[in-house]
């Protein structure tokens, strides 16, 4: 755990979780107990209602009361429906007992329906009485079983309550002891460390602490402080010794520095003269660089304009290529549609041939019908007056056959024209498909040309970009060079100014060196006082 709060919350959470689990289990057991009690009440109520309705049947039979018998039978049916509804609440032996009572109750209702108040069959009456016990006994056995389950469930609830109370109390005690040890152990170690620090003991480390909470972090922080103090005091002790010895060397060194200051002053005068000469040369060089920079900037702008033009051309080529690709797809689609149209025309031509065959058949039938009509007319003429009616019918059949033949001839002519039109349409579709194929081939060629143009434009664009980048780099390099020369000129001017200032400062430094010698003596005395105070700490 990384914090005291998390440890406390964990302990409290575990206890709460145990209590919640205990509550849930108790609640579940109580619900089960309530279900058993409710089932027992339902069965007892059913037993009472059955007894009332059965008694009503017996009274109705004895008193020959049809109305009472009808209401009692209806009550038995209601009880049967209620008991059937209870089946979902039981299982195993209890369910078998309930089903046994239901079967006997159904038999009782059937027997009751056959009872006649005015003349009761004694065997039916006796069977009714027997069924009362057969219905009641399983229900009573079921109530006894529910009572046993109730007692068993109550004992289980008591055992569970005692068990969980013991477990929760033991867990709470364990968590309390564990949490207390985790909190107090690092506090004791921290107290020892702080006491040592208060007495100046820096060379004793804290005992190892495994806790990573706020107390552990505080202990580690104090231990880190001890280490830092130990390093600081050790460093101060060492530094004070070094300062004491260095102060003597500083006094001797200050005298040597005074002699060197005079030599440096003479060198600065010479450096000032050379700076004046270099400044004039750099001004001429700056003018040349500015002229080159102007030319490079003009080249960069031209290359950039050319790059923009090539980019626009490349975009137009991309758009044209995409448009050609769309045209190619549409050409392929149109070619497929032409092929489908040609196939449809071929099917239509085949259908026309089939219709023509059917028309020929109809024409043949019409001719045969005409011959039959002629034969019938001849036979009617032979029959004389008796065959006159038959002759009229034969004449109508002949006319109908001739009209059918004329109609089939017209249909044949129409089919012939339709066949010619279909053949012409098929030829046109074939010509169209051929033209579309040629167009698609031409578009593919154009697409290849545009693809070559696009590749060439990409190459040109790449080369122009390279030129533009080179001119920009050249322009940037010249600008940097110009800026560098300007800075160098400024530096020479500042150097000239600084050498003058440094010369006067060196004169002042010479006087300061004398004061430094006196300060070195005071520093040695302070180092001795610091050494005496550090002796309080044990390192």
Curated annotation (Swiss-Prot):
Record-annotated membrane-spanning stretches: 8-28, 160-180
Record membrane topology: Multi-pass membrane protein
Compartment list: Cell membrane
InterPro entries assigned: Chemotax_Me-accpt_rcpt, HAMP_dom, MCP_chemotaxis, MCPsignal_dom
Domain HAMP positions: 181-234
UniProt key word Ribosomal protein: no
SMART domains: HAMP, MA
Coiled-coil positions: none
Disulfide bonds: none
Pfam families: HAMP (PF00672), MCPsignal (PF00015)
The protein's name: Methyl-accepting chemotaxis protein 3
Organism of provenance: Thermotoga maritima (strain ATCC 43589 / DSM 3109 / JCM 10099 / NBRC 100826 / MSB8)
């Amino acid at each position: 755990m990384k914090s005291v709060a998390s440890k406390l919350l964990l302990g409290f959470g575990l206890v709460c979780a145990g209590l919640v689990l205990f509550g849930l289990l108790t609640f579940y057991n109580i619900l089960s107990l309530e279900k058993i009690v409710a089932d027992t009440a339902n069965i007892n109520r059913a037993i009472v209602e059955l007894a009332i309705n059965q008694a009503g049947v017996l009274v109705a039979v004895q008193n020959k009361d049809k109305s009472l018998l009808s209401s009692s039978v209806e009550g038995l049916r209601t009880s049967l429906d209620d008991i059937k509804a209870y089946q979902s609440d039981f299982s195993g032996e209890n369910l078998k007992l309930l089903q046994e009572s239901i079967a006997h109750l159904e038999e009782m209702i059937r027997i009751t329906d056959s009872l006649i108040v005015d003349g009761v069959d004694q065997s039916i009456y006796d069977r009714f009485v027997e069924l009362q016990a057969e219905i009641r006994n399983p229900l009573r056995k079921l109530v006894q079983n529910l009572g046993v389950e109730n007692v068993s469930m109550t004992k289980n609830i008591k055992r569970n309550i005692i068990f969980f109370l013991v477990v929760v109390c033991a867990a709470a005690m364990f968590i309390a002891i564990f949490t207390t040890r985790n909190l107090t152990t690092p506090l004791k170690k921290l107290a020892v460390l702080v006491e040592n620090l208060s007495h100046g003991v820096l060379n004793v480390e804290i005992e190892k602490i495994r806790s990573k909470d706020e107390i552990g972090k505080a202990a580690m922080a104090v231990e880190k402080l001890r280490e830092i103090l130990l390093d600081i005091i050790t460093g101060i002790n060492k530094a004070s010794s070094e300062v004491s010895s260095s102060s003597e060397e500083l006094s001797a060194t200050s005298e040597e520095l005074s002699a060197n200051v005079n030599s440096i002053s003479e060198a600065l005068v010479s450096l000032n003269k050379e700076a004046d000469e270099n400044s004039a040369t750099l001004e001429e060089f700056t003018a040349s660089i500015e002229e080159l920079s102007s030319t490079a900037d003009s080249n960069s702008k031209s290359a950039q304009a050319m790059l923009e033009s090539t980019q626009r051309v490349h975009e137009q080529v991309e758009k044209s290529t995409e448009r050609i690709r769309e045209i190619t797809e549409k050409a392929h689609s149109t070619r497929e549609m032409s092929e489908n149209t040609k196939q449809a025309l071929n099917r239509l031509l085949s259908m026309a041939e089939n219709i023509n065959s059917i028309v020929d058949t109809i024409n043949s039938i019409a001719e045969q019908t005409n011959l039959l009509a002629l034969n019938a007319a001849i036979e009617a003429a032979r029959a004389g007056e008796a065959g006159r009616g038959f002759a009229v019918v034969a004449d109508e059949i002949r006319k109908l056959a001739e009209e059918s033949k004329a109609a089939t001839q017209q249909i044949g002519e129409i089919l012939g024209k339709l066949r010619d039109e279909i053949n012409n349409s098929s030829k046109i579709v074939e010509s169209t498909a051929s033209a579309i194929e040629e167009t698609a081939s031409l578009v593919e060629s154009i697409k290849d040309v545009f693809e070559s143009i696009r590749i060439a434009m990409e190459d040109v664009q790449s080369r122009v970009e390279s030129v533009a980048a080179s001119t920009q780099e050249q322009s940037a390099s010249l600008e940097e060079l110009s800026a560098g020369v300007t800075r160098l000129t400024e530096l020479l001017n500042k150097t000239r100014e600084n050498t003058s200032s440094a010369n006067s400062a060196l004169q002042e430094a010479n006087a300061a060196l004398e004061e430094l010698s006196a300060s070195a003596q005071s520093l040695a005395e302070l180092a001795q006082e610091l050494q005496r105070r550090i002796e309080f700490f044990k390192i």
